[in-house]
Structure formats: C-alpha cells, structure tokens
C-alpha cells in the first residue's frame, strides 16, 4: 500500500517484514514469525506442507487476532486458532452452479448442504487432510482458473469456505498433484499488502 500524502512511501502493514522475535519461530525466506497459539496450530495441522509459510505478523482486526499464511487466514476466537472463511469471502458474488442430488459412493461424495460434490483426487486429498474441519463447506464444482502463482497457468480448482484445492497435472501420480491454493497470498494482494502479479 502506498501513502500518497507521504510521498508514495509504503504504509507499514502486518505484511511488512519483521525481525525475529524471542520465543517465536522465524522464517527468513518470508521474514515473518509464528508464535504462541498460531505456531501451535501451525505445527499441529501440517505446518508448511498444509498451511504454508506465515505471510504476516499477528494483527488485530475486528477485535480478533489474525495471521495470514500462504494458504489461509488464521484467526483466534475464544483462545482457539482456526482458519477463517476466507474462501467464502474471496468467492463472494460468484455463482457456482450446483449439481443434481445423487447418492454418494466411495468414489464421489455429494454434499447436500451446499449442492456440490467431490470426486477423484480432490476427494482423496480432502479425506486425507481433515476435510471439512480444515477447508470448511464445499462451495463449487471443479472450475479451471489461475492460482495467483505469477505463472499465468490455469488449473482445475475446487472452492471451499476456507480455501481452494487445485490439481497440477505436471505432478500427476505424485505427492503434489493436488495442492492447496495460495488463498492467503491472493487475499493479501487484494488488500494491497503484497505486490500484485
């Protein structure tokens, strides 16, 4: 973000670089810390492989302490840290057509509450990574779109209340064929806290 009144100098934000803090885990590649309940949540629920790296320091907004990672916005409520419904916020205004109801099978899951389904690699990832507890409600069928990684590539993507999954054919059959999208990074760009592509 720039401050026009101050000669276009960057306005400090929670995404501004930080120095290592005592008692925190510091990540020099992104120059941010994780500490306290945010670090505990990060360690318990998959660390870098699931949540990604911290992209901000902890900040308070709307009376809640929050911290962005590559893939999520974590917020603290009642002493507990959990992902915020950032996927719902970033997909607001989009219309995702529902599918006709069907009986779920081991290969395809129908979610009656939202009228959407999960199948194939996305369903396997969802089952292996805490499903609704991590990602929240299913918001879409598979759509093809960019992921904010600055490459211009487009991927099959499926939206959830707290994130999105994307399929990377270049990693087919491997551990990284399905990945969490860079939802936290995208949200920070939209806020003007990270440079746009």
Language-model region placement:
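Extended, compositionally biased repeat/scaffold regions that form elongated interaction surfaces
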Residues: 1-197
């Amino acid at each position: 973000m720039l401050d026009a009144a101050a000669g276009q100098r960057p306005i400090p934000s929670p995404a501004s670089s930080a120095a290592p803090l005592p008692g925190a885990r510091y990540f020099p590649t992104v120059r941010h810390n994780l500490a306290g309940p945010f670090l505990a949540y990060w360690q318990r629920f998959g660390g870098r492989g699931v949540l990604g790296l911290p992209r901000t320091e902890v900040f308070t907004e709307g009376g809640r302490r929050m911290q962005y990672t590559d893939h999520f916005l974590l917020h603290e409520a009642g002493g507990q840290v959990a992902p915020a419904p950032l996927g719902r916020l970033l997909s607001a205004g989009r219309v995702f057509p529902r599918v006709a109801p069907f009986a779920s099978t081991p290969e395809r899951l129908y979610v009656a509450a939202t009228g959407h389904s999960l199948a194939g690699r996305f369903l396997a990832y969802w089952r292996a990574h805490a499903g609704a507890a991590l990602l929240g409600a299913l918001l879409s069928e598979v759509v093809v779109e960019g992921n904010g990684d600055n490459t211009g590539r487009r991927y099959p993507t499926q939206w959830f209340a707290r994130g999105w999954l994307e399929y990377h054919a270049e990693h087919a059959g491997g551990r990284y064929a399905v990945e969490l999208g860079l939802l936290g990074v995208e949200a920070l760009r939209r806020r003007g806290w990270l440079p746009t592509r």
